[in-house]
């Protein structure tokens, strides 16, 4: 009750700050009132999805047909556009979670009925981490990240079983110990697949540190796991354990060149290699992203993938980063009640199933959510959505003395990729790599937290 009251007070203060009346909830219809003559727009990054949203509104509100239009706009930088363009931009906008807090002053606080939806339908870390303290302006809608994938066709043609365990991993390869053993077995006996030697078992990323993150979690480490924006946790033994994992992957020859030599760490660049894997079937295992045309690649290459949680290492399951995309309401809208009514519709089962059919996105629903969706015949999205439940939400903290700097910037701005590469190449021990990360992070945080 205290939370709902606090949200209501926040909503009233926000509406007053923007010089608006607050959205009006109608108990009898479980919907928001629509202001007379309201004209609002929604910004999404898919024309098919935008048109479907307009059609959904017209169906739900036949007396207000034509009140909603859509514009095509990328989610990246969308909240910045609200701050810059104000009421010249869309009323309801698709945004990236990590960009919400920095423009919270330009966003309309959500009505308590919508906040309840966010608290019960989406996964708690995604909802709480993306919203600024004391205000709710964003509800996650769709995953934005990568999941583990395996080439079923390749594995079967090479004589391996793809019978799965309870997280949809092949039982023969549901641990990294088993995958490293496969890499060692192939050292002197490279298999042929579609006329080529298979030189890669898993195209691990090192220099592109966003997609390199899962390797660092092999000993249970989580960046900012203690919730302190000034302590990413590089000094922990579990972080060094992640560097040990990279060293063991190198010793196993997880990835070699055509001449049989281990690939240098500087060439393990991540995203381009994921595309190569998807389009050219270069290895049995990889990561795939929500932005990739997975179904198109399978159809073109005549093969089938499986998607799952990542394998374990010494009993610890590796966890990739995952973010979310969702909607925000432009604080400068002239029709806040109509905007929040559209917002409500966007988080219904019908709207989520429409999103599945007309965009590349997967709903970011918590287990046992009151909303459940059907993926129809889209087994790819269904498997990927289940795999995302094992991912780690990328922290969205800001530095306490510099609200223009995200705490995660330390990870992206110091040369972590070089450290990982040096450990892979044997130029540094895991302990030396850890010591360098601790020193660099302390200096960066001291320089930027002011």
PLM region spans:
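Helix-loop-helix "hinge/cap" segment bordering the ligand-binding cleft or interdomain interface
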Residues: 19, 131-208, 222-260, 331-337, ...
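Hinge/lid segment of periplasmic solute-binding proteins
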Residues: 21-31, 94-147, 156, 177-180, ...
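Extracytoplasmic "Venus flytrap"/periplasmic binding protein-like
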Residues: 41, 56-125, 135-138, 156-165, ...
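Extracytoplasmic/periplasmic substrate-recognition and gating elements
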Residues: 65, 134, 298-367, 401, ...
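Extracytoplasmic ligand-binding clamshell segments of periplasmic binding protein
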Residues: 74-82, 197-198, 220-300, 310, ...
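Long, aromatic- and glycine/proline-rich binding clefts that accommodate carbohydrate-like moieties
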Residues: 308, 357-418, 422
């Amino acid at each position: 009750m205290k939370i709902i009251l606090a949200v209501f007070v926040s909503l009233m203060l926000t509406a007053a700050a923007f010089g608006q009346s607050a959205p009006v909830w109608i108990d009898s219809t479980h919907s928001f009132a629509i202001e007379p003559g309201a004209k609002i727009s929604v910004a999404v990054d898919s024309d098919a999805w935008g048109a479907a949203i307009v059609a959904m509104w017209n169906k739900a509100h036949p007396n207000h047909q034509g009140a909603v239009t859509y514009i095509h706009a990328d989610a990246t930088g969308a909240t910045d556009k609200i701050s810059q363009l104000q009421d010249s931009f869309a009323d309801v906008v698709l945004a990236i979670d990590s960009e919400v807090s920095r423009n919270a002053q330009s966003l309309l606080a959500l009505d308590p009925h919508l906040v309840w939806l966010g608290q019960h339908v989406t996964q708690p870390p995604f909802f709480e981490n993306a919203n600024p303290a004391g205000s709710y302006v964003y509800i996650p809608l769709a995953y934005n990240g990568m999941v583990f994938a395996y080439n079923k066709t390749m594995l079967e043609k090479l004589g391996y079983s793809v019978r799965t365990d309870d997280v949809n991993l092949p039982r023969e390869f549901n641990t990294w110990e088993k995958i490293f053993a496969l890499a060692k077995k192939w050292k002197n006996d490279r298999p042929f697949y579609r006329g080529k030697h298979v030189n890669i078992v898993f195209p691990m990323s090192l220099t592109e540190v966003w997609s390199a993150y899962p390797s660092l979690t092999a000993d249970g480490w989580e960046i900012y796991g203690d919730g302190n924006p000034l302590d990413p946790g590089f000094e922990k033994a579990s972080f060094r354990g992640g560097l040990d994992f990279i060293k063991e992957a190198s010793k196993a020859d997880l990835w070699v060149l055509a001449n049989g030599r281990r690939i240098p760490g500087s060439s393990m660049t991540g995203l381009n290699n994921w595309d190569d894997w998807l389009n050219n079937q270069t290895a049995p295992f990889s990561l795939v992203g929500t932005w990739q045309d997975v179904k198109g690649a399978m159809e073109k290459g005549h093969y089938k993938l499986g998607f799952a949680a990542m394998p374990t290492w010494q009993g610890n399951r590796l966890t990739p980063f995952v973010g979310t995309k969702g909607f925000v309401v432009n604080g400068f809208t002239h029709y806040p009640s109509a905007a929040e009514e559209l917002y409500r519709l966007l988080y219904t089962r019908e709207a989520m199933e429409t999103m599945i059919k007309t965009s590349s996105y997967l709903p970011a629903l918590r287990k046992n959510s009151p909303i459940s969706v059907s993926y129809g015949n889209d087994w790819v999205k269904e498997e990927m959505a289940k795999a995302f439940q094992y991912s780690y939400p990328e922290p969205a903290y800001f530095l306490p003395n510099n609200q223009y700097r995200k705490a995660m910037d330390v990870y992206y701005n110091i040369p972590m990729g070089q450290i990982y590469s040096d450990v892979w190449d044997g130029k540094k021990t895991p302990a030396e790599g850890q010591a360098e990360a601790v020193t660099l992070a302390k200096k960066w945080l001291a320089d930027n937290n002011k």
